Amino acid sequence: MTNINRIGLTWISFLSYAFTGALVVVTGMIMGNISNYFHLSISQMSNIFTFLNAGILVSIFINSWLIEIISLKKQLIFSFILTIIAVIGIVLCNSIFLFSINMFILGLVSGITMSIGTFIITHLYSGSKRGSLLLLTDSFFSMSGMIFPIVTAYLLEKKIIWYWSYICIGAIYLLIFLLTINSSFEKFKTNTKNSKETKEKWNFNVFLLSISALLYILGQLGFISWVPQYATEIMNIDIKKTGSLVSGFWMSYMLGMWFFSFIIKFFNLYRMFIFLTSMSTILMYCFIKSENFLNQQYIIISLGFFSSAIYTIIITLASLQTKHPSPKLINLILLFGTIGTFLTFIITSPIVEAKGLYVTLISSNILYGIVFFLSILIYFNKKYERVI
């Protein structure tokens, strides 16, 4: 494989996460504008995230088998066509039902592309290089989540209608399409053939890592989703100031992924997993117990930094459980992570209603604690001793 082709495929992986990040963040940002457009309340618009997440969940689930039937290149080209159809549908639709269908289609595209992006990195690179590039790939989700709100805010400020945000997001997939038609995917055809011929045996750590992915994402989103309301209602902090907590978390999260992508090769991944989950659990507890807003700002920035590499390390460790990680193995972790996202408000909303915001954040902290416990189990249960 030529170096230029490898770079092109790597950028497809980067942009696949950027596409999903922009889609998720922008949809939440313009929900008020969308509800006004369709003359609905904000609560009635909540099904947008349900359809979007359902699309991502379904596509990641079926892509494990789809990849053995349809080549990666054809999937990406077909996904580009679906993106065009969905964006045009969003622009032209005049009912919330049609809008929800188009969001489901974008969710399908997002899930397929993200799983392909992860699969590409795990098969192009190995060892510490794989871990570093998976972290760098994941950082494009956060980077896109920072850039596109600025673009969207500019469009809305200029009185440009909200659906232009989705047209801009579609431009990311145009870049993916251009890279796809100019790249060779022959290496992956051989890999998928080999995975059919040799049955992959998964050890118990694969199950533990899958559960870790679900609990980590559920704990993270359950925490960060309710932090603004917690700071406002429990801490009596001005609503404008609470935004700095969330933005500080995601900024340090992105910087943390960049930092760990460079230093991860010097450490054992199993021990790094234990260290980061323990630090994150302690920092989250300190945030919840703190009664000083300035301290909370420092703590949540530290939390974002130390928790940034956990999910990618889970994916990397899963890929190292077998000699030749299959699409099914990688998609299993992504599937459990997506289930965690899907369950966030389904699980946390009843807790908020019944027990309050404090108990909800404590519940997220407990989930982080369980992931820390699982990281220790995974360390002692590892099948292969690898220093990475």
UniProtKB/Swiss-Prot annotation:
It is found in: Cell membrane. Keywords: Cell membrane, Membrane, Transmembrane, Transmembrane helix. It holds the Pfam family MFS_1. The chain crosses the membrane at residues 11-31, 50-70, 77-97, 101-121, 133-153, 160-180, 206-226, 244-264, 268-288, 298-318, 332-352, 360-380. It is a multi-pass membrane protein. Gene3D superfamilies: MFS general substrate transporter like domains (1.20.1250.20). Signal peptide: none annotated. GO terms for cellular component: plasma membrane. GO terms for molecular function: transmembrane transporter activity. Belongs to the major facilitator superfamily. TsgA family. This is Protein TsgA homolog. It comes from Buchnera aphidicola subsp. Acyrthosiphon pisum (strain APS) (Acyrthosiphon pisum symbiotic bacterium).
